[in-house]
Amino acid sequence: MSQSGKNGLTYSDAGVDIDAGNLMVEKIKPHVRSTRRPGADGEIGGFGGLFDLKAAGFTDPVLVAANDGVGTKLKIAIDANKHDTVGIDLVAMCVNDLVVQGAEPLFFLDYFATGKLDPDQGAAIVAGIAAGCREAGCALIGGETAEMPGMYSGGDYDLAGFAVGAAERGQLLPAGGIAEGDVILGLASSGVHSNGYSLVRKIVSLSGLAWDAPAPFGEGTLADLLMTPTRIYVKPLLKAIRATGAIKALAHITGGGFPENIPRVLPKHLAAEIDLDAIKPPAVFSWLAKTGGVAANEMLRTFNCGVGMIAVVPAEEADRVAAVLAGEGETVFRLGRMVARQDGAPGTIYKGSLAL
């Protein structure tokens, strides 16, 4: 029989503070409301989040779902006590995976797990999630905050995100008809994004630099620059898809780099020929390669190396698609082309060299 009365145990004695959780909910409500969009009212507190597809303007939609995390980039956030941008990363990693299938992100849910809940820290994280949702045009309709003493040490926490989008039936990507000679457009990344951070942290450890030290590759501290949020490509890509009808395939360059991600959207008889001379890697990648002695091939299969997204388009439409994307604020360049692929050959081949 459990103890009761004034000397009995409480949930708080076990390390779970329900009042702290309630305080965090009150702090995040304005951020959640800021993500309101057609189909979602921007309120939280129910047992489940609601979304009205008809109110969002869809007639015969196919739903597309994705989930992801931020990986060990979170360790930098924790060590540097900088929590206001990892939520943007969380949203970006999910919604960029939706748009590559031609889907408009509609709603997002998050999972935040920690050993000891700090309401201000949690609110900062959710503020970043809300900022990412606004940028992607999706509503934050719910989430879970789990305080789990004994599961996480110190100030450690983890995040997971879940996004659902939709496309009208028949408008999903990749589309058919990818052909030899099609052009591959590259869209510049904002930096390292959210992949390869275990290697990043290893290199920083070897360098002996503290997180608050001036970054050797740009203006700001090492933590600030390495915490640059993942770019969200949703609205520019949706504009280009709808305005041109010319995009045949998109690939989000995440873990595994070019060789693991581009072939996922290609037919087996075609390969992507990437012109490495066309890439202008941000200075952070040169610093990582030189400081860690990381070979170019390893860089290409670990990091985005300056290209966060690629689009496959007909050669005659490349300039028009690039112009639409540039008009929406993207840095776009011709990255390569589609070539015939021999049996057993890799789906990504390179020419030129990466300027690291």
UniProtKB/Swiss-Prot annotation:
GO terms for molecular function: ATP binding; phosphoribosylamine-glycine ligase activity; phosphoribosylformylglycinamidine cyclo-ligase activity. Its EC number is 6.3.3.1. The keyword DNA damage does not apply. It catalyses: 2-formamido-N(1)-(5-O-phospho-beta-D-ribosyl)acetamidine + ATP = 5-amino-1-(5-phospho-beta-D-ribosyl)imidazole + ADP + phosphate + H(+). Keywords: ATP-binding, Cytoplasm, Ligase, Nucleotide-binding, Purine biosynthesis. It is an enzyme of class 6 (ligase). Its main location: cytoplasm. GO terms for cellular component: cytosol. It comes from the Bacteria. InterPro entries: PurM-like_C_dom (IPR010918), PurM-like_C_sf (IPR036676), PurM-like_N (IPR016188), PurM-like_N_sf (IPR036921), PurM_cligase (IPR004733). Gene3D superfamilies: PurM-like C-terminal domain, PurM-like, N-terminal domain. One of its GO terms (biological process) is 'de novo' IMP biosynthetic process. The keyword S-adenosyl-L-methionine does not apply. SUPFAM superfamilies: PurM C-terminal domain-like, PurM N-terminal domain-like. Pathway: Purine metabolism; IMP biosynthesis via de novo pathway; 5-amino-1-(5-phospho-D-ribosyl)imidazole from N(2)-formyl-N(1)-(5-phospho-D-ribosyl)glycinamide: step 2/2. It is found in: Cytoplasm. Pfam families: AIRS, AIRS_C. Belongs to the AIR synthase family. PANTHER family: TRIFUNCTIONAL PURINE BIOSYNTHETIC PROTEIN ADENOSINE-3, TRIFUNCTIONAL PURINE BIOSYNTHETIC PROTEIN ADENOSINE-3-RELATED. This is Phosphoribosylformylglycinamidine cyclo-ligase. It comes from Sinorhizobium fredii (strain NBRC 101917 / NGR234).
